[in-house]
UniProtKB/Swiss-Prot annotation:
UniProt modified residues of type N-acetylthreonine: T2
GO CC, one annotated term: chloroplast thylakoid membrane
Protein name per Swiss-Prot or TrEMBL: Photosystem II D2 protein
Source organism phylogeny: Eukaryota, Viridiplantae, Streptophyta, Embryophyta, Tracheophyta
Function of the molecule: Photosystem II (PSII) is a light-driven water:plastoquinone oxidoreductase that uses light energy to abstract electrons from H(2)O, generating O(2) and a proton gradient subsequently used for ATP formation. It consists of a core antenna complex that captures photons, and an electron transfer chain that converts photonic excitation into a charge separation. The D1/D2 (PsbA/PsbD) reaction center heterodimer binds P680, the primary electron donor of PSII as well as several subsequent electron acceptors. D2 is needed for assembly of a stable PSII complex.
Organism of origin: Pinus koraiensis (Korean pine)
Residues reported to bind a plastoquinone: H215, F262
Amino acid sequence: MTITLGKSSKEEQTLFDTVDDWLRRDRFVFVGWSGLLLFPCAYFALGGWFTGTTFVTSWYTHGLASSYLEGCNFLTAAVSTPANSLAHSLLLLWGPEAQGDFTRWCQLGGLWTFVALHGAFGLIGFMLRQFELARSVQLRPYNAIAFSAPIAVFVSVFLIYPLGQSGWFFAPSFGVAAIFRFILFFQGFHNWTLNPFHMMGVAGVLGAALLCAIHGATVENTLFEDGDGANTFRAFNPTQAEETYSMVTANRFWSQIFGVAFSNKRWLHFFMLFVPVTGSWMSAIGVVGLALNLRAYDFVSQEIRAAEDPESETFYTKNILLNEGIRAWMAAQDQPHENLIFPEEVLPRGNAL
């Protein structure tokens, strides 16, 4: 008998292998390497938002009450942006503005940059989580690719737009009413609804809702009646391998309705992926354009020319009237650093706006 002496064929695990095994272990809530980014950032972003909406005022940045402590409700509470005078400062707690004073940091709007940056990295961590899990179970990464759409919208609206303007002040505050105020601002100062990138975004979102409704109804309509259960949910074994609905019947139905229909499940579902993701990406691209103050669709160029050239003619539409009304109504309070004062006769009155 021959005995071979030597090293074991199985090498000892390195520290990296040990950590990798622990992070990617099969457990109720998967952690993974992406979790090192996702969980801390999501925790801090949500914690900062709950803290800000509960306790922190916006008196020093916007002249507003914005917390539950001051009497706001879920609709009016917000984590408000820093003052315009702070420009694009990261407002670090230990930075020159707050100098380690937590109360001062909150008063200056430090929670907004805290929530925005941790929120952005949290969303990126969630997309990486989908990549990591897809790779580990040998799926294609289309979930992660689809999630790039809300990330693009968040980053363009909350980070790129204010970076193109004079400061974080012009980003949306984190609150329900604050987001609607920001939408009004976008319309009044950028004529956003007439922007073709916004139109593509609306087409994507509403088109996706239509596709989702049609798809869900069609699948329900064409379920095989081969179960004994009283309803859809009891008629099938949840782990059965066979199809539960008839693609052929669905194709025949829609061919009769429209004259055309999806005949391939892959193309159908890719289209349902493509429509909302592309629409959201187009909206994000449009917001980047607004960050740079591109003036193609907001009529400001026509208004300036009309003001400078008496012989210039322009259509004075209800759209222009709406935008001028929004600007007059919002500007004085929305941009307090400009010290704008409008005479009473030019401001909207009664129920005009």
